[in-house]
């Protein structure tokens, strides 16, 4: 069999299409796994007493990290920002804690209907974006952590 330009072109195009398909499947699986974990560990989390459930935390080594926390017992949601200064971490609430009245889901988007303005969680191709009144933050899937419980400060 003789290799012609047409045969080589078809071979390269086939490999390119297979590579793109594999990349697309990988992106879908990462996003789908993150969304399933969010649903299991956050939306349907069953906390003991007044424990809060943290959904998004960015890498521990970062100077700033954003957290979306939920207290199933109190039905409240809060967004906080942790800042690292040397070896010391400080955390400030930047939104909440506000009462959650309902959670709406539409494909890759969750909308938390709260006593204030809604909080929107969008699962994108490479990251999760949380939008709230006054701002937003985005976390790549590689820095995303789920299901971290900690006692509420009110206990």
Locations of regions flagged by a protein language model:
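Short, Lys/Arg-rich N-terminal segment immediately upstream of the first membrane anchor
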Residues: 1-5
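Intrinsically disordered, low-complexity segments enriched in glycine/proline and serine/threonine
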Residues: 8-9, 51, 78, 108
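Prokaryotic Sec-type signal peptides and long signal-anchor helices
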Residues: 13, 32, 42, 46-49, ...
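Extracytoplasmic electrostatic interaction patches
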Residues: 57, 82-155
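N-terminal export/targeting and maturation segments
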Residues: 22-96
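Hydrophobic membrane-insertion alpha-helices, especially the h-region
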Residues: 10-26
